[in-house]
Each structure stands twice: as structure tokens, then as C-alpha cells.
Swiss-Prot record:
SUPFAM superfamilies: Prokaryotic lipoproteins and lipoprotein localization factors (SSF89392). It is found in: Periplasm. The keyword Chaperone applies. It comes from Salmonella typhimurium (strain LT2 / SGSC1412 / ATCC 700720). This is Outer-membrane lipoprotein carrier protein. Participates in the translocation of lipoproteins from the inner membrane to the outer membrane. Only forms a complex with a lipoprotein if the residue after the N-terminal Cys is not an aspartate (The Asp acts as a targeting signal to indicate that the lipoprotein should stay in the inner membrane). Residues 1-21 form the signal peptide. One of its GO terms (biological process) is lipoprotein transport. It comes from the Bacteria. Its main location: periplasm.
Amino acid sequence: MKKMAIACALLSSVVASSVWADAASSLKSRLDKVSSFHATFTQKVTDGSGAAVQEGQGDLWVKRPNLFNWHMTQPDESILVSDGKTLWFYNPFVEQATATWLKDATGNTPFMLIARNQASDWQQYNIKQDGDNFVLTPKASNGNLKQFTINVGRDGTIHQFSAVEQDDQRSAYQLKSQQNGAVDPSKFTFTPPQGVTIDDQRK
């Protein structure tokens, strides 16, 4: 009986691993169908009790695997741009721009996962698929991300995604008017405006 229980446990583990692998493959395959796009987005952040913390909106341009421009326009403007090597974060309000190497950027944030769509990133998660919804749970428990959910159609269109942190704060993003196709290369370059303080962390 004990051997039977052990065998069943091992089988369950193998089946679960297979399901997670299939879900990861399906997610990557769907995202691979669109190499570049532009979309507008709305953001809603709620705390652990469900109370609203912040609402915002902006524009997103992506050219996989390493070019992207995340432009938050409301409530406060901020810009996150990758030119393929350097990751720039610019906050016009405080007039400061931070530069880091893209290769050193964390791969466990929802946006980086979507923009890079690398198999090595998805392997860090247990992934379950329910139709167009994919629920990702980090295999490691030492990060701030508790769960990540993304809704992406068979044609590669991302409809929405959300992230739940360890303190149960939830950030939900809804993408609208996704336009697939070539994106102006200038969207993936950034030149700090004159007078802006630059924090260059590319060491």
C-alpha cells in the first residue's frame, strides 16, 4: 500500500509537471505570434483589503525580445524604455533618469516577462492554463511577486494582466486597441532632457 501511495504521488508529480510545461509552451507560443505592437492601457492598484490605491493610464510599445517603451501618462508621468542594452527609467516630476543594463534587470516582474517572452523566464513559474487565462506562481518564494495572471488570445493579443504581491496588493492592467505591426524605432531610444539628473548604474 505504501509503495502504491509513493507511485501515485510520483505519477501526480509527473502529470503536474507535464501540465505546467504544456501551459508554459502554450503561453510562449501565443506571445510569439506578435513580435511588435502598440497598445493603450489602464491601471488599477488595490491593497490587500480591495481598497483602491491608484488608477492610471498610458501607452505601451513592444518589439520582442528586448525593445519596449512603457509610458505612464496619468496620474503621474513616468517612462521605462529599453533600447536592447540599456534600461532607462525617467521621472519628469523629479527630473531624474536612471540607467541600468537590461541584462541585469530582474526577470520576475510581469512587464519584463511579457516583453522578453523567454523560455528561461517562464521556467521559473508553475503555470496553469484556463482558456485564454494563464496563472503563474513563482517556484521560488523569496521574491515579492505572489502570483501573476495574463489573458492572451490565440492570436497573441494581450487583453489584460495582473500581479499580486506578497502583501496582497494587486496591480491590474487592461490593454486596449492593440495594434500589431512595425513600431517606429524612435520609441525605443531615450535621450535624457537637458538639466535632468542622471543616475548611471551601468558599472
